């Protein structure tokens, strides 16, 4: 009976990872909004930056909240906020509507990322945590690479779009979010008392202080910066890859949307194969191989002008960046096992890199073309290479 319950819980958690991938629609969505509202790069990049801004604000409070209400209830709340975020764009595409929708999408994803990863540790712990988190990222990547296709099909009327064009993406993902919510609601997940009540007698202010104090540990701080670089490269490639194809190959946005899908296809392949490689290959070696792939990718994206070189470069960064988050996150959780909720909050706060990188990349690309954006991402890749010596 226990195995059956654990299997059901694991399935529900994996569907939540799929819902977590909804946030990656912001990359292709911002390109369509840029086209429809005639925005420049710096203004259009406000949308992905806004989504990830909320990781800075809500990650640590979510970690504290988990101590009060538990991990499962926090994930349920995140799904509710995400569903509302996906509902709003159905009714219009004004700048303000999109700002509100992307803000709520960012808040919901902050709650989800902070609580879902520790929930996985509740369902599957021990040596299988990193590989299970990687498999969750594989499921998440499926939602990520489907988004550009669904948006393009809606824009070209290849599928019924109900008069809203590319925005048909939102109601489709909203329906899946509702299914994920119901499945998790009816799944029994036993949480240890220490995971939900520990620290409840302390004041909220003291819990915040204890959480931020963890950044005083060198490994936690280095991991925090590593997460910032990972997500900066992720969001940066998501938004910049189509622009590179448009700039250098002179293709339309609908055709360039394939670049985002290609990135997430190889991220998906990377997560899936990484699930197995992490069981047989040393974590540090696999991390170094992944970062070297990204370094090669940055070189290709910086100087490449042919379709083959650009596609290979996008594939390399997709595969290389696919397992970085899981490796860093698992290392951080295992470094401070008695403070997993707090560490999770700090690591997810590092996703604020998804705000910092696109803003700098937007300014760089307006000044230097898309090569400027690639240089910004390359700085993040170089940091990850220096971080690799800390991976155990």
Predicted regions and their residues:
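Cytoplasmic helix-loop-helix junction between adjacent transmembrane helices
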Residues: 101-138
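Central cavity-lining transmembrane alpha-helices of secondary-active solute carriers
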Residues: 46-64, 261-273
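Intracellular juxtamembrane helix-capping segments at the cytosolic ends
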Residues: 111-125, 322-337
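Helix-loop-helix hairpin linking two adjacent transmembrane segments in secondary transporters
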Residues: 127, 132-189
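Extracytoplasmic gate region of multi-pass secondary transporters
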Residues: 26-27, 213-261, 268-271
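Conserved MFS/SLC helix-loop-helix module at the cytosolic interface between two early adjacent transmembrane helices
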Residues: 57-96
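Helix-breaking motifs and short loop linkers at transmembrane-helix boundaries and internal kinks
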Residues: 38, 70, 91-96, 250, ...
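Helix-to-loop junctions at the C-terminal end of transmembrane segments
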Residues: 58-71, 270-282, 365
């Amino acid at each position: 009976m226990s195995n059956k319950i654990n299997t059901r819980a694991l399935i529900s958690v994996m569907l939540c990872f799929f819902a977590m991938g909804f946030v990656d629609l912001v990359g292709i969505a911002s390109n369509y909004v840029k086209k429809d509202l005639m925005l420049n790069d710096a203004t259009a990049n406000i949308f992905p930056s806004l989504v990830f801004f909320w990781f800075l604000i809500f990650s640590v409070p979510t970690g504290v909240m988990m101590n009060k209400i538990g991990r499962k209830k926090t994930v349920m709340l995140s799904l509710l906020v995400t569903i509302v975020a996906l509902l709003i764009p159905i009714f219009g595409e004004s700048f303000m509507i999109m700002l509100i929708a992307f803000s709520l999408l960012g808040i919901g994803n902050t709650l989800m990322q902070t609580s879902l990863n520790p929930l996985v540790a509740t369902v599957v712990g021990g040596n299988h945590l990193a590989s299970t988190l990687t498999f969750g990222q594989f499921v998440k990547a499926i939602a990520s690479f489907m988004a550009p296709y669904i948006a393009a099909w809606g824009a070209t009327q290849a599928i019924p779009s109900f008069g809203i064009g590319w925005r048909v993406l939102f109601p489709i993902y909203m329906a899946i979010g509702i299914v994920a919510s119901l499945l998790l609601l009816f799944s029994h997940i036993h949480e240890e008392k220490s995971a939900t009540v520990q620290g409840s007698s302390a004041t909220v202010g003291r819990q915040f202080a204890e959480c931020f104090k963890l950044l005083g540990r060198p490994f936690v701080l280095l991991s925090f910066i590593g997460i910032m670089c990972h997500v900066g490269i992720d969001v940066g490639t998501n938004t910049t890859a189509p622009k590179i194809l448009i700039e250098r190959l002179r293709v339309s946005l609908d055709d360039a949307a394939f670049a985002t899908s290609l990135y997430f296809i190889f991220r998906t392949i990377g997560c899936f194969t990484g699930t197995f490689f992490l069981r047989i290959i040393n974590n540090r070696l696999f991390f170094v191989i992944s970062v070297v792939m990204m370094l090669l990718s940055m070189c290709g994206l910086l100087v490449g002008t042919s379709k083959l070189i650009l596609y290979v470069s996008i594939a390399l960064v997709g595969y290389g960046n696919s397992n970085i988050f899981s490796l860093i996150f698992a290392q951080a959780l295992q470094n401070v096992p008695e403070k997993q909720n707090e560490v999770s909050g700090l690591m997810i706060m590092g996703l604020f890199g998804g705000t910092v990188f696109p803003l700098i990349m937007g300014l760089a690309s307006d000044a230097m073309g898309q090569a400027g954006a690639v240089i910004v991402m390359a700085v993040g890749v170089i940091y990850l290479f220096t971080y690799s010596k800390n991976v155990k």
